Amino acid sequence: MARSVWKGPFVDGYLLKKAEKVREGGRNEVIKMWSRRSTILPQFVGLTFGVYNGSKHVPVSVSEEMVGHKFGEFAPTRTYYGHGADKKAKRK
């Protein structure tokens, strides 16, 4: 179920403060964050966030197309190694 419109997008407060500091300073540094549930806002466009995936911070550069999505969508938590090969077919 989608979030109701009257509530507005969810963003952790500390994230807004960190993004504002980086914008004011003019630095282009990676903003480390653990809040995968936060929504990407238009003021985050052009910034780079390090989204934690459970083991490391994955760098995510925010673009216009990402606005409205969640940060967690761009940092996969699981590694897919493919399905196991058929051992009988391999032996022949």
Curated annotation (Swiss-Prot):
<dbReference type="InterPro" id="IPR005732">
    <property type="entry name" value="Ribosomal_uS19_bac-type"/>
</dbReference>
<keyword id="KW-0694">RNA-binding</keyword>
<protein>
    <recommendedName>
        <fullName>Small ribosomal subunit protein uS19</fullName>
    </recommendedName>
</protein>
<keyword id="KW-0689">Ribosomal protein</keyword>
<dbReference type="GO" id="GO:0006412">
    <property type="term" value="P:translation"/>
</dbReference>
<dbReference type="GO" id="GO:0003735">
    <property type="term" value="F:structural constituent of ribosome"/>
</dbReference>
<keyword id="KW-0699">rRNA-binding</keyword>
<dbReference type="InterPro" id="IPR023575">
    <property type="entry name" value="Ribosomal_uS19_SF"/>
</dbReference>
<dbReference type="GO" id="GO:0019843">
    <property type="term" value="F:rRNA binding"/>
</dbReference>
<dbReference type="GO" id="GO:0000028">
    <property type="term" value="P:ribosomal small subunit assembly"/>
</dbReference>
<comment type="similarity">
    <text>Belongs to the universal ribosomal protein uS19 family.</text>
</comment>
<dbReference type="GO" id="GO:0005737">
    <property type="term" value="C:cytoplasm"/>
</dbReference>
<dbReference type="InterPro" id="IPR020934">
    <property type="entry name" value="Ribosomal_uS19_CS"/>
</dbReference>
<comment type="function">
    <text>Protein S19 forms a complex with S13 that binds strongly to the 16S ribosomal RNA.</text>
</comment>
<keyword id="KW-0687">Ribonucleoprotein</keyword>
<dbReference type="GO" id="GO:0015935">
    <property type="term" value="C:small ribosomal subunit"/>
</dbReference>
<dbReference type="InterPro" id="IPR002222">
    <property type="entry name" value="Ribosomal_uS19"/>
</dbReference>
<dbReference type="Pfam" id="PF00203">
    <property type="entry name" value="Ribosomal_S19"/>
</dbReference>
